[in-house]
């Protein structure tokens, strides 16, 4: 059995508005299988034995989080989110208690403990690691008008997923330095790569999807249903004990 070293901090940037969903509330507060997307996400993290703290970065005028039952969990700490993901994560890093942090998208409610176990084991043996899925479709490069310029070799291409796990202090420095220089930081791995760290890919499950568009809601609901059917539900945690 892998030593998972309890005491990790998970960071969940949840300050975005999710405009592509076209909903009246931010996408993380949309209902999915009886709970909000964010509740599913937080419950998956909180139920893992290695995670001792979850920091949620919220929009300054968020009026939805306090209505969630999970908001009362004493392991959850709130910070103010920024205009971009990197600023939200950096605000959370300033108060993170653990030596290692996992950053996970608020709108990825189908994360399993099996993927978390694999990520933790790999990250702690190197500079850090992220979950990913291999590109399986044929990839094309186009010009600005949409004309195909080339077919791209997909052999070494991955879709970056979350969580992404790194040592707390190096990640904080990497984000601070990158932001100070105006670098484009699309995820935590890009900041660490820029700072010279070697980041490992860990192949994750295909059902660890991010809810971005309206059609993703039904797909995420199907994945949750399938995951629950494979493992008996626990009395107070119907979706979180999944491998």
Curated annotation (Swiss-Prot):
Pathway listed: Isoprenoid biosynthesis; isopentenyl diphosphate biosynthesis via DXP pathway; isopentenyl diphosphate from 1-deoxy-D-xylulose 5-phosphate: step 2/6
GO molecular-function term, one example from the UniProt record: 2-C-methyl-D-erythritol 4-phosphate cytidylyltransferase activity
GO term, biological process aspect, one: isopentenyl diphosphate biosynthetic process, methylerythritol 4-phosphate pathway
Site keyed Transition state stabilizer: positions: 20, 27
Cystine pairs: none
SUPFAM superfamilies from the UniProt entry: Nucleotide-diphospho-sugar transferases (SSF53448)
Catalytic activity, as annotated: 2-C-methyl-D-erythritol 4-phosphate + CTP + H(+) = 4-CDP-2-C-methyl-D-erythritol + diphosphate
Function: Catalyzes the formation of 4-diphosphocytidyl-2-C-methyl-D-erythritol from CTP and 2-C-methyl-D-erythritol 4-phosphate (MEP).
Protein name (record): 2-C-methyl-D-erythritol 4-phosphate cytidylyltransferase
Organism for this UniProt entry: Aeromonas hydrophila subsp. hydrophila (strain ATCC 7966 / DSM 30187 / BCRC 13018 / CCUG 14551 / JCM 1027 / KCTC 2358 / NCIMB 9240 / NCTC 8049)
